[in-house]
Amino acid sequence: VLFRSKAIWGICEAAAIDAVQNPGAPFKAGDKLVLKVAKDALWMKLPSGRLICWQKPAVEMLTTPWGAQKLGITVHTQNTYTRNWTRNALIGSSIFQSAVQGTARDFLAEAMLSLDKAGYSVINSIHDEVLLLVEEQNGESAMEEVIKLMTTPPKWAPDFPLQAEGWYSKRYKK
């Protein structure tokens, strides 16, 4: 499977370079990701349809960590320490990581909406966990239903294999 290999990093980077060099035209990275430049931003469409955006993309010659020169993408980002705006390289592995993390978020968000629709009180989420408030005597049956709801794939990924496990207690534990 392509997404289990480093090859997808290069595919993501190549699609991003193509998109920046051809504004307005969509470029596929694998079967589920599409990159396109519009309104001075590089957009990546996730399987859910949600978009991830990088500001002011440009194609430049970049120096790799091992000293080689190669064509790459830079984007306008804010330094997390100085809060100053600067240009930084956007490499294929970062593009793919954004796709993976964004898609994981979309799966969890869909599950939270399903839980809410089923009448559960979602009080928090922490990374890949959802915290619910249920009556103590309903803990076991609620956990079974919650796992069923959380492992039902969304319409945009009908064949995606989802797994979940759970526990219930009076207090949150890690």
State the predicted function of each range.
Residues V1-K174:
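Conserved catalytic core of nucleotide polymerization and phosphodiester-bond processing enzymes
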